[in-house]
């Protein structure tokens, strides 16, 4: 029997995932007490119905599960069944918006605000997140995309959506992009702003790009940063992440960060990475 544990943060899409698994023929059960897991498995094994796939939703609502999830997984393994743990996540901003739209209270802490509930839940589930088979960030997903991803995961990875990389340049002067997964500060590179003939232009212009790339430290940095991204991207894909935001920052977001982002974009696009590029602050501070 194949068993999938659906867990993660409240508001992250677990209910949608369960509906997708039900459509695939899974027998789904929500909020099963830990003390009944072994009994439930035995009942399914001896049932007259041919149940081969089971999904159990187990999360913060069951404090016994949070304290003893290792015992749950051990009991399943001892019974000779395979188990996958799908951990659903989203950014705090997205979770807060979802709770606001549905006007629901956060279930983790009675009487707490939604942000307080999210922080508490993240802390309580941190250990479970570390051992998950897949971590699914639903921040940028619609319902259709989430269902397709879940179905792909239970089929052993077949049909899993390709991760999208969103590469953007920005200026630290205007604040960090809140949605960033990775941030690289390139303010250590030579600055075309201090070259009078280059100042009016941007990192999209050939003269600025040649100036930035014409220094040895830029070439060495870019080589190492590309290598790091090539190492990280497959790991994020295996984690189940569908969207990765990489932000490159300089002082004003017009020269160095734009030039470096363009170099990275062209490099990874030639290697068939699903990548998009934006320049958040390129037109700011022009007058």
Swiss-Prot record:
Molecular function terms, GO-annotated: ATP binding; GTP binding
Superkingdom field: Bacteria
Residues where ATP binds: 8-15
SUPFAM superfamilies tied to this protein: P-loop containing nucleoside triphosphate hydrolases
Binding site for GTP: 59-62
Keywords: ATP-binding, GTP-binding, Nucleotide-binding
The protein's role, per its UniProt record: Displays ATPase and GTPase activities.
Family assignment from sequence similarity: Belongs to the RapZ-like family.
Protein name, per record: Nucleotide-binding protein Gbem_0872
Organism of origin: Citrifermentans bemidjiense (strain ATCC BAA-1014 / DSM 16622 / JCM 12645 / Bem) (Geobacter bemidjiensis)
């Amino acid at each position: 029997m194949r068993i999938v544990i659906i867990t993660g943060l409240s508001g992250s899409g677990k209910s949608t995932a369960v509906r997708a698994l039900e459509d695939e023929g899974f027998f789904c059960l929500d909020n099963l007490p830990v003390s009944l897991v072994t009994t439930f498995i035995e009942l399914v094994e001896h049932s007259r119905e041919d149940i081969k796939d089971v999904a159990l939703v187990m999360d913060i609502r069951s404090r016994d599960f949070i304290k003893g999830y290792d015992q749950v997984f051990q009991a399943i393994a001892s019974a000779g069944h395979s188990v996958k743990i799908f951990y659903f996540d989203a950014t705090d901003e997205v979770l807060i918006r979802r709770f606001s739209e549905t006007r629901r209270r956060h279930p983790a802490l009675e009487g707490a605000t939604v942000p307080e509930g999210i922080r508490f839940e993240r802390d309580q589930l941190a250990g479970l997140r570390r051992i998950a088979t897949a971590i699914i960030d639903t921040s940028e997903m619609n319902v259709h995309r989430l269902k397709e991803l879940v179905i792909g995961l239970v089929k052993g990875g077949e049909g899993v959506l390709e991760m999208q990389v969103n590469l953007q340049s920005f200026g630290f002067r205007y604040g960090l992009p809140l949605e960033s997964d990775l941030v690289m500060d390139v303010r250590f590179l030579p600055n075309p702003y201090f070259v009078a003939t280059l100042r009016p232009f941007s990192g999209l212009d050939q003269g600025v790009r040649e100036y930035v790339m014409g220094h040895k430290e830029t070439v060495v940095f870019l080589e190492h940063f590309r290598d790091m991204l090539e190492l990280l991207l497959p790991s994020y894909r295996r984690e189940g992440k569908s969207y990765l935001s990489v932000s490159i920052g300089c002082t004003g977001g017009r020269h160095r960060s734009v030039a470096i982002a363009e170099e990275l974009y062209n490099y990874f696009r030639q290697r068939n990475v699903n990548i998009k590029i934006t320049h958040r602050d390129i037109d700011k501070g022009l007058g």
